[in-house]
Curated annotation (Swiss-Prot):
Superkingdom of origin: Eukaryota
Region of interest called Disordered, as start-end residue ranges on this chain: 1-22, 229-265
Protein name from the UniProt record: Degenerin mec-10
Primary localization: membrane
Result for mutant: A673C: Slight increase in channel current
Organism name: Caenorhabditis elegans
Length: 724
């Protein structure tokens, strides 16, 4: 309703003042405008006043123009209002739009309704269009920026107690050699492995350094040159080797006669010989206890060493090389103390009969015509994993090293560990029995202070004398991971050697990623088909799950290196079709990742441990105490532990950790703020103005519906009247 404030005080137009019939009428009209109640109670001629108001035009009247329906209401305060319900439908719509133009809080629209002429109105229409176009451009840019779903990474350094991670410890030798050979499949595999290694060694010996003179003619001149051929490995001629021997101590020479093809029955008939792979000669030989690991000043190209340097040797040529010397010190051979010693009875012949292996079984093992020792060992390790998968988990656990045989001493935060309670067994296909420290997810462990003394310190005994011939190194495999994660020692582990104290300094990082639509991370929990049941989701586990599903689908068997799905049997070690199918798809795994057939995202919440490594020789000669379960003299125990034991330290370098969290760079709040800012800048529109437009739309819709219903009622009445 439009109410003209100027009508509150009724002032007739001076030019029409004289047009009143008499002063009585004028006084009556003023009295009517002054006191409506008194006027109704008076004897004023109401019809005369109404006639005067409708007969004369006044400048202040809004209803002076002619209309089809003209009904003005007189209010108590003297105003005159139009009742829109008495207007026609089109006039009512027009009236509402006009009123909206006058009342809206938008800056440009009222100027259209109040424009005095068409030119003025056209200018404002042009300005409104320019502003509307500019606003649309800015609004599109704001929406596009929001749809990018950009994110920012916040890095915080928190000085708080960090939870101690889970530590998984494994022996680099998965199974005990003395136990595993009783298994027929393993015996066959080791037999084929030794024969293949022997052939590879023979071919390498033939390809060792040799010089030959060649003559060739260049421009008519005969030139003699020496050409040096180098084999695959540049190793010395002599190396220590275990052999069965017959020793005659009566002659006082302490030398023994080797029986290289026989397996010794014990330490009484075992000796160490200087073995030459080129000539297969083993000489000299002495009892095992007469050889001592030490350091030599010089070693030649054949690995023959001397404790004392020869006269005239320059200081720059002096080197402290690890070597093994017989008791008199007259004969020394270069030898890494932690390296395995060759067994001649295995090198020259097999202690078991492997004639039962068929040609198909040999082909299934995949050695083929391999001559590279490293590749042969890798293939042999894979074959052992396949063969062991045919056994039950309980059988595999019994064939690997027990908890107390591996873990001798342990302390955490400077206090002794409970080895039985603090370490949990986890069977791994590659490393056999592994033991997890801090496995209980309900117990919170943390370091009191930073440094090695307040972390995990553990002494481990690997028993190198019971290693498989496929175990290339002696030591421990260590993995640092979160309690909820599977350790994956074959992928994320670190190797620590025996005879050293290995220190692993840690720093923790916590990652918090945004899920969809800002990212594609996997939220808490594992996926439904995740093969590592009971563990949190990880990218490595996802890829292994995808690969296992692919192998089962295409080969009909599962890869024994990973957990199976749905009880599918693992691929058999001597099944040629299984092995060829598995090898084929293993080489295609890179293409699978590249073509996104295996789509594995990062977890939304992840704990990462970065590690720094250092080592020192252990135990020291001053450590003259009986270590672990050694009952010998202190010096002998030290030597034994140098070859068979390792000391590990895992600790926090500082009691703080980083928190990396992702957050939305441009959220809905910022988008609405920018949107409203541009809307106010270019159109002068606020949220309240938008509400005004919404109310106008509802009013127009309501009037349209009411008009439609009213028209239907009129038609029904007309039809009913026509029927009568």
């Amino acid at each position: 309703m439009n109410r003209n404030p100027r009508m509150s005080k009724f002032q007739p137009n001076p030019r029409s003042r004289s047009r009143f019939q008499d002063e009585t009428d004028l006084r009556s009209l003023r009295s009517f405008k002054t006191d409506f109640s008194n006027y109704l109670a008076s004897d004023t001629n109401f019809l005369n006043v109404a006639e005067i108001m409708t007969s004369y035009a006044y400048g202040e009247s809004n209803n002076a123009h002619e209309k089809e329906i003209q009904c003005d209401l007189l209010t108590e305060n003297g105003g005159i209002e139009i009742d829109p319900t008495r207007l026609s439908y089109r006039e009512r719509i027009r009236w509402h739009l006009q009123q909206f133009c006058y009342k809206t809080s938008s800056h440009g629209i009222p100027m259209l309704g109040q424009a005095p002429n068409s030119l003025y109105r056209a200018a404002w229409v042009f300005l409104l269009l320019i502003c509307a176009i500019q606003f649309i451009n800015q609004a599109v840019a704001v929406i596009q920026k929001y749809q990018k779903m950009d994110k920012i990474t916040d890095i915080q350094l928190k000085f708080d107690t960090a939870p101690f991670p889970a530590i998984t410890l494994c022996n680099l030798n998965p199974y005990k050699d003395s136990v595993i050979r009783s298994h027929d499949s393993i015996s066959k595999i080791l037999g084929v492995f030794k024969s293949v290694m022997k052939k590879a060694g023979d071919s390498s010996s033939e390809a060792l350094e040799e010089e030959e003179e060649t003559e060739y003619d260049m421009n008519g001149i005969t030139i003699q040159a020496k050409r040096k051929k180098r084999g695959a490995g540049e190793k010395g001629t002599f190396e220590p080797a275990n052999s069965a021997c017959e020793c005659d101590e009566e002659d006082g020479s302490n030398e023994c006669e080797e029986r290289s093809t026989e397996k010794p029955s014990g330490d009484n008939d075992m000796c160490i010989c200087a073995f030459d792979r080129q000539t297969n000669d083993a000489w000299p030989c002495h009892r095992k206890e007469q050889w001592t690991n030490t350091t030599c000043q010089t070693c030649d190209e054949h690995y023959l060493c001397s404790k004392k340097a020869k006269k005239g040797t320059k200081r720059s040529e002096l080197k402290k090389e690890p070597c093994i010397c017989e008791s008199k010190g007259l004969f020394c051979i270069k030898h890494e103390h932690a390296a395995m010693v060759l067994n001649l009875w295995e090198y020259f012949g097999d202690s078991e009969d492997f004639s039962e292996i068929s040609t198909e079984e040999r082909e299934a093992l995949g050695f083929g015509n391999m001559t590279d020792e490293v590749a042969i060992v890798t293939k042999a390790k894979e074959n052992i994993i396949f063969a062991m998968s045919a056994l039950s988990e309980e059988q595999r656990i019994l064939m690997s090293q027990a908890k107390h045989n591996l873990i001798h001493k342990c302390s955490f935060n400077g206090k002794p560990c409970d080895i039985d309670q603090d370490f949990e067994l986890v069977a791994d296909p590659t490393f056999g029995n592994c033991f997890v420290f801090n496995h209980d997810r309900e117990i919170f462990k943390s370091s009191v202070r930073a440094g090695p003394q307040y972390g995990l310190r553990v002494m481990l005994f690997v028993n190198a004398s019971d290693y498989l011939p496929t175990s290339e190194a002696v030591g421990i495999r260590l993995t640092i991971h979160d309690k909820d994660d599977f350790p994956f020692p074959d992928t994320f582990g670190y190797s620590a050697p025996t005879g050293y104290i290995s220190s692993f300094g840690m720093r923790m990082k916590k990652m918090s990623r945004l899920p969809a639509p800002y990212g594609d991370c996997v939220e808490d929990g594992a996926t439904s088909n995740y093969i590592y049941k009971g563990y949190a989701y990880s990218t490595e586990g996802c890829y292994r799950t995808c690969f296992q599903e692919l192998i089962i689908d295409r080969c009909g068997c599962s890869d024994p290196r990973f957990p199976s799905i749905g009880g599918v049997q693992p691929c058999q070690v001597f099944n040629k079709n299984h092995r060829e199918c598995l090898e084929k798809h293993t080489h295609q795994i890179g293409e699978i990742h590249g073509s996104f057939k295996c789509r594995c995202q990062q977890p939304c919440n992840q704990t990462i441990y970065t590690t720094s490594y250092s080592e020192a020789i252990w135990p020291s000669q001053a450590l003259n105490i009986s270590l672990g379960q050694c009952e010998k003299e202190a010096e002998e125990c030290n030597e034994e532990y140098k070859e068979n034991a390792a000391m590990l330290e895992v600790f926090y370098e500082a009691l703080n950790f980083e928190v990396l969290s992702e957050s939305e760079a441009y959220g809905i709040v910022k988008m609405m703020a920018d949107f409203g800012g541009h809307l106010g800048l270019w159109s002068g529109v606020s949220v309240m103005t938008c509400c005004e437009f919404v109310c106008l739309a509802f009013e127009l819709i309501y009037m349209a519906i009411a008009h439609h219903i009213n028209q239907q009622r009129i038609r029904r009445r007309e039809n009913a009247a026509n029927e009568y």
